[in-house]
Amino acid sequence: MINTLLEKPEYKIVKTRLGTWRSFGYVDGTSFHEFKSDATWMGLPLIHYTYGRSPETGRRVCAKGVIAIGRLACGIIAIGHASIGIVAVGQLAIGLLFGLGQLSTGIAAVAQMALGVYFGLGQFTTGYIAIGQFAYGKYVLAQFGFGEFVLSMTQRDREAIDFFKTFPVIKDFFH
């Protein structure tokens, strides 16, 4: 839905005390919505939310803000299908500190495929502490684990058992 006439689209603009909403409805019933807060921090809007395809370009708009929410999101806290931020939540979540999603990265990552530096929790996971079905790390708790100290179906390192017993949630599983 690209703007073939190269005309400026007629947005419905609503100003609230927190920011500005821009909306555009297409003839086929789809729509585009965007909210940007008036408050900013280091040049970024405090909240930026996007939904749908831009009537100007026909493409999705990347939400960029301190808190960014949209199909594509980039911010300190980013929430979207593909998100990049210090804290990222989404199907593809590239987080610096924390990632939560189907495929995520971060110092701590929780996902189906979690690539954590310090902590990873997921089906396929890495991290200094790795907990998952298939896991790789220094301290590993997994069905199939690889690493220095592993507690798995086939391996029971004493160091791994003692380490994981220090976590109250996990120690109850040991008899």
For each predicted feature, which ranges?
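Repetitive, compositionally biased segments used for assembly/scaffolding
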Residues: 2-175
